[in-house]
Amino acid sequence: MVNIVINQEIEFLEEKSAWQGVKRVAGYVRNDMEKVFGKKPAICAGDSPKSQTVILYGTIGKSKRLDMLESAGKLELSGVRGKREVYLFQVVENPMEGVKSALVIAGSDKRGTIYGLFYLSEKLGVSPLVNWNHVLPKRREYVILTEKDSFVSKEPSVKYRGFFINDEWPAFGTWADKHFSGINAACYECVFELLLRLKGNYLWPAMWASNFNLDGPGLKSAELADELGVVMGTSHHEPCMRAGAEYGKMRGEDSPYGDAWSFLTNEDGITNFWRDGLIRNRSFENVITMGMRGENDTAILGADATMEDNVNLLRRVLKTQNQLIRETINENLDEVPRIMVLFTEVEAFFYGDEKTKGLLDEPELEGVTLMLSDNNQGAARTLPTKAMRNHKGGYGMYYHMDMHGGPMAFEWIGSTYLPKLWEQMTAAYEFGVQEIWVTNIGDIGTQEYGLSFFLDLAYDIGKWGGRDAAITKEYTKKWLRTQFAACFEESILSRMTEALWDYNRLLARRKHEVMNERVYHPVHFFEAEDVLRCCEKLLNTAKEARRACPIEMLGAFVSLFYFPVCGTANLMKMWILAGRNKLYAKQNRMEANDLADEVLACIKADKEYVKDYHEIDDGAFYGFGLSKHIGFRDENWNDENCQYPLRTYAYPADEPRMIVAKKNDEHYLTGGFWCERPLVWRDAMRKDVSEIAFEIACGSEKEVQYEIHTDCPWLHFSKKQGTVAKTEHITVTIDKSQLKGKETGKFFVKNVGYGEAEIHIEAEEEKKYPSGYFLWDNGRVAMDAGHYTAKKDVKNTGFLRMAERTRR
């Protein structure tokens, strides 16, 4: 069997004719191999390598060595030639004189070769996040590849796959300033490398206060993108390769671009601005954004403008832009990738209304990829109808993993729930959205988990599309082991996988910014208790794993796991405790004061987790944790007037005060002498309930001495007397075998010397019910969606239960 030993002695055969970007990526891979083997492999630029084993890489049409190997019958390149972003990965015996074996990486084009080179790194155990998150690979002496490792890659499922760096201040911008003195070409080299390692190829650059084509300095960032094969675009409101902030730098009364961002009053100036942008970037590989919005990502016309006004203006804009592209880039518009993003009010202008025909079927949009969008919260707004799917230019999706805007901003720790992402994007693909996928990734930092899945899904929908969302659990397990299999035992990795999933699921219910003390009721249905238990488990798992983490992997561990998990769990815990503090203070429980102190501890911990994230690895991730994330108010979508939870302290009563309450009910008794009616607990009317947990709490400076009395033979208590300074937890057990029909049992909790609380428990003897029978509980009946009596699928259409998408 043909094989090759990959180690530090292997040589890279480099051809002068190779793409410069491919050579640069080969350098990245050599650096990866140094991390694996301890020494960087040498480069041979001639025809006489010193080693008998070599890595021969090249692009079909730009490599004489590949031509020679094909002519000699050593390679079969027909499965690669002419394809999009495809590579051959093959072990070849005796490829040239003096060489025993070679690993050949042959790309159909520049990006195909680059993906093939990075695939080699992955085969050696190198994570795509090796440089972005400092994920160190396991050290090895060698890796053996055989002819069984040879294969030809598939064409990517989605043509353009990428992300949008958006809302970049204070997080990404601060990080870039610290490490690169700005969002410049040096900064973008790190971003481009990450994008390509994740098998993406398309980028919308940062644009809040950044100018991709000016801050390189100059065009250096654009030139580097083109060198590396990264296709550049601009966001939904930045037409003709112009950054949104550029116009503000160039406008003026004496400017050729005029002094008004208005196609109505300054058509010539805006046209000149677009023309010069197209000319400046025409030598690079771009996808050109079409259309127009108002300044700073606002509506193009005022509130008084009609649908007809807006649609007619956009028709003029599109006609002008297409003409400019013909004049400056290519007369054949079909050869120029273009998009129009149907986002915010532009979506309405596309579809029109009952009075005004929209831009649907507009001739100027022929050949333009129509970018649909989600609702800013991860749910696709529209998908192409069957009649729309033949649109020349195809469809794309603009998806938010970060949002600075309504209905509520979320910009801190990555909060995209993988099963929802899977559901939305696989549905989009099935409806023909296959040309472009781009996600608003915000600051990149802490989004790596969700971003990895988004781009892997776009690259190979066949592998990760699957039949249902359960495949996202498999992905989570694989992703975590890609990062940490080299440094943790399987038992710890299993707990980390569960924790990563649970943290992600918590955020599917409520994101950080909009969590508050009202979301989960402090006692109803034990929902707050369940969340609190989950948070404590997450914190314990993360801290246990940190103790086992090698010091050289702490940067990767903290950035990819510890900070997202602990930051999220601590925040959720803080709000749960705040809700409980508020309720208990209202009841005057002394435990409320302890809870107030615990809330304060969580507030301090929140700051400590961010500080730890920023300081780890000599500040490698400094800035990524800066976004505001706590207590966004209902009246604002953003962080204006946001606040940490309020803490309430209870002042102790003068005399011993007792509070008796069921654990899942806010109603309580104090046992006072006047006007108190008994509490009635009906939990035991349920077939599956034979125990009720309740609490005896102290609401005074003096301790409460209590006694429990009952004449009911079927009520049994875990404890019947004691002294309480804070809270006593007691369980009453109902022996249903003694019941005959429905009965009511009474018991009394005595605050010795100060009163008595009376409790009634309603219970019913055990009954047998037929399968599929639903029981009332306190006036409610619960039926899960999976409790259907019949389900009939028709052809390829039907209902599929997705357990991962439930809230429970």
Region spans (language model):
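Histidine-centered catalytic/metal-binding microenvironments
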Residues: 527-695, 746-747
